[in-house]
Amino acid sequence: MTNIAIFASGSGSNFENIVKHIQTGQLSGINVTALYTDNEGVPCIDRAKNLNIPIHINKPKDFSSKSLYEQHLLKLLSSEEVQWIVLAGYMRLVGQDLLQAYEGRILNIHPSLLPKFKGLDAIGQALESGDTVTGSTVHYVDSGMDTGEIIEQQQCDIKPDDTKEQLEDRVKHLEYELYPRVIAKIIK
């Protein structure tokens, strides 16, 4: 059994999707030790409660430096014997402490076909670009913003009359298929 921690900052829909894949046996040999979130009062917390997944709420502003924040996280991760970190809507850059401790063992999913449209509002950027396709990317995490080695991508069309909400929904459904599939391949 491989222990993973899932980091999320907001909705937590990808977190919930991964946990449900594990709970239904579609993703075997993996245990989610906890949800790690950097915010209070966000939907991912309610999702974790409903799924009976432990929750760690750690706000960076409660620490005097990013390094101290990450050292605190590392103590929790170590106590839970976490082998992999899976980012699912975690809206912070991962710092050197976590990167060094989990080198090559942190995954992220991003709602664009990287290297296009890094960072926030990738869906909005894709719509404004005039591109006819976008998608989702699973990649290893490095010190940059959405710059790690790409593992796998899946694309969908951008329709001429798409609203942001319609395209977000289509990309989100890609992510629900893509992320568990990649996790099953990469995390053993």
Swiss-Prot record:
Keyword annotations: Purine biosynthesis, Transferase
Enzyme class: transferase
UniProt-listed InterPro entries: Formyl_transf_N (IPR002376), Formyl_transf_N_sf (IPR036477), GART (IPR004607)
Keyword match rRNA-binding: no
Pfam families: Formyl_trans_N
Active-site residue numbers: H110
Keyword Cell membrane: no
CDD domains in alphabetical order: FMT_core_GART (cd08645)
Protein name, per record: Phosphoribosylglycinamide formyltransferase
Lineage: Bacteria, Bacillati, Bacillota, Bacilli, Bacillales
